C-alpha cells in the first residue's frame, strides 16, 4: 500500500500564485457583468445612509500616486460601511474647468485667437471628457467600486445650473460684491488667483533699504530726518504713496555722521549691523502714534508719502517703517483706504509697468527692479542692496511668481458670515484633530474671496450691466440663466447677446434704451467644486447633505474643504460635511517629493501592471496616511511579501476544508478542545480589533492585525499544530472536524475582513469557500465574534502557554544547532516548568506532543528540580534528547510502536489504526 495516498493532504484549485496583473482585469469584467455597484446598492437599500462625498480630481492627464492613495482610502471606507449596516453610495466626480485645460489645448497647437470663445470652449469640453474617460478607467483598475456610469462632472449643464443658483443665493444675501482690491495676480495666466491656487517656492529677490526724506515733521520731527524702509519688491516703489508705522512701537531718531534716520528702536542693532553704521547714536525716541500724518518725500517722484498707523507693522524683519503701496498689498490697501489714499497700480495684466510709472513704462515688473534700484542709487536714496532667497508665492499652474495687484474683481464677502463659518468648523469632526485648528485659523484670517477670473474656460459670472453701469443680479435673472444653462450648457452665455440671455421683456431703470451688456469674467474653479454640496449631494436622490465625510489631501484645507464650507455656510448656514479626514502626500523611498527632474516618479499604472491593484491597495493600508507617506520598489517588495503570506494562508485554509461541509461537519463550540476554542478567542480578538480599526479609519492597524494573525497565530502556531491531525487522522475524526470547524470560521471571517482592502483577492477566494451562497463577498456583512464561554480565562491560560512554548522552541533551536536533533519531530523533550505553569501543562498534557511538534513529551519536576545542565528559560527548563524508536513512514513521528501491527510494519500504532479503519476494506 502507498501510505502517502492515505494522507489527507490539502487540496484546492485556488492558485498559489496571485498573477494579479492578469486576474484582476478578469475579476473587474465579472463585476461589470454582474453590475456589482448596483447589486450592493440594492442589497443595502433601506439601511441608514453613509455618504462619503468625492472631492473631484482635476481632469487632466494620468492619475498619479496621490490620486491612487486618495481613491483607495475612500474605497476602504465605503466598502466597510456597506458591510456594516449602512447603505454607502459612492458617486465619483471630476473638476473640469480652468487654466490647465486651456493650456493643454494651446500646447497641442490650438490657435485660440483664430476662433470664437464659444468654439474654443467646445474644444475644452471635448478635451475634458477625454481626460475623464482616461482617468475613469485607471480608477476602475484600482478596484474602486463606484457609480462609474453616473459620475458628477462640473462642466455638465445640470451641475452648472446649480452652481449659478449657489451664486444667486449668495448674491441675494449680499455676500457677492464687485470692488477694486489687490488680489493675487498671475502675469503668466493673465488672471486673478485665489489663495488655493498659489504655492510657495524659493525665489531670489533684491533686498533694499531706502531713505525717504521727511518733508513735514508736524512739530514732532525737525524735518532733516529720513525714514528708512526695507523691501524685496523694488518694482512696487513707483506705486508708493505712504509709510506705515505701528502705533505702539517706539521709534528712534538715529544720528549717523551727518544724517538722521528713523527706525523702530528694537531694530536698532539689526539695522545698524546690516547698514554697517559706525558711531550711530540714538538722539531721540518717539512713539509710533506721534508720527501719524508726518509727511515724507517719494525718493524719485515729486509727490508725498504719508506716514500712517498700521497694526500690520511688525519687528520680525526690516526697519519698522513699512513701504505702503495700496495698489500692491492687502494691508497697504486697508491702511490706504482708511487714510483716503488713491489705489495706484501702475502694472497691467501682463505684469508690465504702465505710464503711471514714469521712466519705467514698458518694463516687465521683474525686469524693472534693476533700473529702479539704479535710480535710487542715483538720487542717493539707496542705503543697501543685497540679494536674498525667500519663500515667495507662485502660480500653481504655471509655476511662475505672482504679484499683488489691484484690479476690479468680483468677491464673496467672507467677513459677512465669518462667525457662522467658525461655528461650522467647531461642529465638524476632524481627523486628524489638528485639521480643526488649521481650518479655523484659515477662516479666521482669510480676506474676502476673489471669485472672478479673466479666462475663457469656466462658468460665467451671471451678471448683467445696465446702461448706467449698474450690475444686475436678481432672482429673475439668476433663475433664467440657470434654466438656460440646464438646457444648453454655459456655452450659451458666449453664443448669445445679453438681451437674449435675459428673461423676455426684462426692463431695468438703469437701461432706459433697453441696452444691456454681460459680464465677461468666469468663476474661480474652486467655486465650481465648492458648489458640489448643492449640485450633487442635494440634487441626487441617493445622496444627502451634509455628507458624512469629505476625505482629501491636506492641501485641501485651503482648497475644497474651504471653498465647500464657504458656499455651504453662505447658502444653508451649515457645513456641507459632518466629518473631514485628510491624508498626506506620497514621497519617494527617501522621503523626497516626486519630480520629473529627479526621475523618482512612481506611477500607479506601472505598479498595477507589474504587481497588481491589490498590492497597491495593501500598500495604502500599510502606511500612516495621515502624514506624508513613502513608496519605492523596496517598500512594495515588502508589501508583496505580506500579500503572499495572506494569500498562502487562504490557500492553506481552503486546501484543508476541501472535504468539509459546514452544514454537516461543524462541531459545536462547547465540544471543541481548549486549543481550538482558544483559536476562536483569538479570531474574535481579530474581528473586534479590525472592525474597530476600520471604524476609526486606522487602516494600518487593520493591515498589521491581519498580517500578525496570519503569521503568528495561524502559521507559526495553530496551523503548524493542526497539520498533524488534519493530514494523519481519518476524515471524520472528531479532532480533525473540530480543527476544520475553526479553520472554516477563520476562513469566512478573514475573507470578509480583507474585502475592503483586497477586494479582487477576497472575491477570488469566495467561490471556493464551502457553503458560500452569495454571488460576491461584497454582498455579505462583516463577521461577528463567536460566543466562547469562559473566553477571558481561556485567553489568560493559553497566552501563558504561548510564552512557555516560545521557551521550548528556543531550546529545540539550540538542540538543532548543536546537532542533538535534526528536526523537531526527532526530539524527546522533558520540561521542568515553574510551579504555576506545571498545573497548566498537566491540564492539556494529551495535546502537548502536537503543540510542541515533538515525538515524545515528558513532564519532570519544577524548574528548581531541573538537572543543572538543562538550559533554563523564563518559564521552564528544557531537556532535549533524541526520541527513542523508529520513524513512522506515514506521520514521521519517532515511536517505539513501529511494527507492532504486523500488517503495517513501518507504521506507528496510531497510523496503523487510522489506515485499517479508513483505507483497508
Curated annotation (Swiss-Prot):
GO terms for molecular function: aminoacyl-tRNA deacylase activity; ATP binding; isoleucine-tRNA ligase activity; tRNA binding; zinc ion binding. CDD domains: Anticodon_Ia_Ile_BEm, IleRS_core. It comes from the Bacteria. Keywords: Aminoacyl-tRNA synthetase, ATP-binding, Cytoplasm, Ligase, Metal-binding, Nucleotide-binding, Protein biosynthesis, Zinc. Its cofactor is Zn(2+). Gene3D superfamilies: 1.10.730.20, HUPs, Ile-tRNA synthetase CP2 domain-like, Valyl/Leucyl/Isoleucyl-tRNA synthetase, editing domain. Signal peptide: none annotated. A motif ('KMSKS' region) lies at residues 593-597. It catalyses: tRNA(Ile) + L-isoleucine + ATP = L-isoleucyl-tRNA(Ile) + AMP + diphosphate. GO terms for cellular component: cytosol. Zn(2+) binds at residues 888, 891, 908, 911. L-isoleucyl-5'-AMP binds at residue 552. Belongs to the class-I aminoacyl-tRNA synthetase family. IleS type 1 subfamily. This is Isoleucine--tRNA ligase. It comes from Bacillus mycoides (strain KBAB4).
Amino acid at each position: 500500500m502507498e501510505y502517502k495516498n492515505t494522507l489527507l493532504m490539502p487540496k484546492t484549485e485556488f492558485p498559489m500564485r496571485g498573477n494579479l496583473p492578469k486576474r484582476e482585469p478578469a475579476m473587474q469584467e465579472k463585476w461589470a457583468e454582474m453590475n456589482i455597484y448596483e447589486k450592493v446598492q440594492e442589497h443595502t437599500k433601506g439601511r441608514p445612509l453613509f455618504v462619503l462625498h468625492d472631492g473631484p480630481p482635476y481632469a487632466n492627464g494620468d492619475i498619479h500616486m496621490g490620486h491612487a492613495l486618495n481613491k483607495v482610502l475612500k474605497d476602504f471606507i465605503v466598502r466597510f460601511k456597506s458591510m456594516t449596516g449602512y447603505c454607502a453610495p459612492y458617486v465619483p466626480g471630476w473638476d473640469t474647468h480652468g487654466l490647465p485645460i486651456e493650456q493643454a489645448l494651446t500646447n497641442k497647437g490650438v490657435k485660440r485667437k483664430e476662433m470664437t470663445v464659444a468654439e474654443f470652449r467646445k474644444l475644452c469640453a471635448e478635451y475634458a471628457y477625454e481626460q475623464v474617460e482616461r482617468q475613469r478607467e485607471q480608477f476602475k483598475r484600482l478596484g474602486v467600486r463606484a457609480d462609474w456610469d453616473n459620475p458628477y462632472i462640473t462642466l455638465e449643464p445640470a451641475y452648472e445650473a446649480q452652481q449659478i443658483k449657489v451664486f444667486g443665493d449668495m448674491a441675494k444675501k449680499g455676500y457677492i460684491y464687485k470692488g477694486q482690491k489687490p488680489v493675487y495676480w498671475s502675469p503668466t495666466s493673465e488672471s486673478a488667483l485665489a489663495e488655493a491656487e498659489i504655492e510657495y517656492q524659493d525665489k531670489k529677490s533684491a533686498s533694499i533699504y531706502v531713505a525717504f526724506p521727511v518733508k513735514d515733521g508736524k512739530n514732532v520731527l525737525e524735518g532733516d530726518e529720513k525714514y528708512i524702509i526695507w523691501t524685496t519688491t523694488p518694482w512696487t516703489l513707483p506705486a508708493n504713496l505712504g509709510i506705515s508705522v505701528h502705533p505702539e512701537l517706539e521709534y528712534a531718531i538715529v544720528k549717523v555722521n551727518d544724517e538722521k534716520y528713523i527706525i523702530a528702536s528694537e531694530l536698532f542693532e539689526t539695522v545698524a549691523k546690516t547698514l554697517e553704521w559706525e558711531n550711530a547714536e540714538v538722539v531721540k525716541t518717539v512713539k509710533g502714534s506721534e508720527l501719524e500724518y508726518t509727511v515724507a518725500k517719494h525718493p524719485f517722484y515729486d509727490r508725498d508719502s504719508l506716514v500712517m498707523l498700521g497694526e500690520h507693522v511688525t519687528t520680525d524683519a526690516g526697519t519698522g517703517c513699512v513701504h505702503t503701496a495700496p495698489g500692491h498689498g492687502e494691508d497697504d490697501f486697508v491702511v490706504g483706504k482708511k487714510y483716503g489714499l488713491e489705489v495706484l497700480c501702475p502694472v497691467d495684466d501682463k505684469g508690465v509697468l504702465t505710464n503711471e510709472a514714469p521712466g519705467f513704462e514698458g518694463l516687465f515688473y521683474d525686469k524693472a527692479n534693476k533700473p529702479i534700484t539704479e535710480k535710487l542709487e542715483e538720487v542717493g536714496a539707496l542705503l543697501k542692496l543685497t540679494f536674498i532667497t525667500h519663500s515667495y508665492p507662485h502660480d500653481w499652474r504655471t509655476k511662475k511668481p505672482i504679484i499683488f495687484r489691484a484690479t476690479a474683481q468680483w468677491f464673496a464677502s467672507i467677513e459677512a458670515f465669518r462667525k457662522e463659518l467658525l461655528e461650522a468648523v467647531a461642529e465638524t469632526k476632524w481627523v486628524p484633530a489638528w485639521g480643526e485648528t488649521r481650518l479655523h485659523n484659515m477662516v479666521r484670517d482669510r480676506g474676502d474671496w476673489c471669485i472672478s477670473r479673466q479666462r475663457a474656460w469656466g462658468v460665467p459670472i451671471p451678471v448683467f450691466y445696465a446702461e448706467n453701469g449698474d450690475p444686475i443680479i436678481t432672482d429673475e435673472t439668476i433663475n433664467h440663466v440657470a434654466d438656460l444653462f440646464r438646457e444648453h450648457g454655459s456655452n450659451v452665455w458666449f453664443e448669445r447677446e445679453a438681451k437674449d440671455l435675459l428673461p423676455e421683456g426684462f426692463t431695468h431703470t438703469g437701461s432706459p434704451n433697453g441696452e444691456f451688456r454681460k459680464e465677461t469674467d468666469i468663476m474661480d474653479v474652486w467655486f465650481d467644486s465648492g458648489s458640489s454640496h448643492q449640485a450633487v449631494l442635494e440634487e441626487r436622490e441617493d445622496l444627502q447633505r451634509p455628507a458624512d465625510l469629505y476625505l482629501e489631501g491636506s492641501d485641501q484645507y485651503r482648497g475644497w474643504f474651504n471653498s465647500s464650507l464657504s458656499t455651504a455656510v453662505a447658502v444653508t448656514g451649515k457645513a456641507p460635511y459632518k466629518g473631514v479626514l485628510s491624508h498626506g502626500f506620497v514621497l519617494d523611498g527617501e522621503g523626497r517629493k516626486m519630480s520629473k527632474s529627479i526621475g523618482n516618479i512612481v506611477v500607479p499604472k506601472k505598479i498595477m501592471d507589474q504587481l497588481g491593484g491589490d498590492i497597491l491597495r495593501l500598500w495604502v493600508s500599510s502606511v500612516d496616511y495621515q502624514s506624508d507617506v513613502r513608496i519605492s520598489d523596496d517598500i512594495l517588495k515588502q508589501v508583496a511579501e505580506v500579500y503572499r503570506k495572506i494569500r498562502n494562508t487562504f490557500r492553506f485554509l481552503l486546501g484543508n476544508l476541501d472535504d468539509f461541509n459546514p452544514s454537516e461537519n461543524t462541531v459545536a463550540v462547547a465540544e471543541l478542545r481548549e486549543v481550538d476554542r482558544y483559536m476562536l478567542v483569538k479570531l474574535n480578538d481579530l474581528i473586534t480589533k479590525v472592525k474597530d480599526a476600520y471604524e476609526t479609519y486606522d487602516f494600518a492597524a487593520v493591515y498589521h492585525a491581519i498580517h500578525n494573525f496570519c503569521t503568528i497565530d495561524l502559521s507559526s502556531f495553530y496551523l503548524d499544530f493542526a497539520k498533524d491531525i488534519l493530514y494523519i487522522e481519518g476524515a471524520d475524526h472528531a479532532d480533525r472536524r473540530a480543527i476544520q470547524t475553526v479553520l472554516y470560521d477563520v476562513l469566512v471571517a478573514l475573507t470578509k475582513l480583507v474585502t475592503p482592502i483586497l477586494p479582487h483577492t477576497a472575491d477570488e477566494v469566495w467561490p471556493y469557500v464551502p457553503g458560500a451562497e452569495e454571488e460576491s463577498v461584497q454582498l455579505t456583512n462583516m463577521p461577528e465574534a463567536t460566543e466562547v464561554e469562559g473566553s477571558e480565562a481561556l485567553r489568560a491560560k493559553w497566552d501563558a502557554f504561548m510564552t512557555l512554548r516560545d521557551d521550548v522552541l528556543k531550546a529545540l533551536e539550540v538542540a538543532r544547532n548543536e546537532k542533538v536533533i535534526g528536526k523537531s519531530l526527532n526530539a524527546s523533550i522533558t520540561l521542568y516548568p515553574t510551579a504555576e505553569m506545571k498545573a497548566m501543562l498537566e491540564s492539556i498534557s494529551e495535546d502537548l506532543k502536537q503543540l510542541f511538534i515533538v515525538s515524545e513529551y515528558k513532564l519532570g519536576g519544577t524548574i528548581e528540580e531541573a538537572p543543572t545542565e538543562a538550559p533554563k528559560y523564563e518559564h521552564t527548563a528544557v531537556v532535549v534528547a533524541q526520541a527513542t524508536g523508529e520513524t513512522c513512514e506515514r506521520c514521521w513521528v519517532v515511536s517505539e510502536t513501529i511494527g507492532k501491527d504486523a500488517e503495517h510494519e513501518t507504521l506507528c500504532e496510531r497510523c496503523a489504526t487510522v489506515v485499517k479503519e479508513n483505507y483497508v476494506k
